[in-house]
């Protein structure tokens, strides 16, 4: 275990650059579909509207579940807070990174709601970003919590039951 890594508290040492990139990406995930959406009509419009609203709702609930489970240990930084505890119940029993998963599901729903192919392409890029951020975060989680390795074998990273 690299205790020196866990003790660093500077912006970069805590993974601050991941946070600095994350917030503009989230803004773009909202803006790109709005700029590039296509008008479609008929039954497809109704189906996409319903599917997108369901996805946005599921994503919001999953994100909220993760926020509630973390409580006062919630941080935008990938490095866990020194006093934090490993969460494996609730939303964390479904995926190891429910906040990232919830955000990705909401972004997908928004891209479908706005009928935006560019938004869908951006959603893939957002997935890659969160996957890389989660990989860095998991190094710190494994250092801090010896039981993290067993947890990561039981529960998928971002896509429930798949990945």
Give the residues covered by each predicted segment.
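Hydrophobic alpha-helical membrane segments
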Residues: 98-106
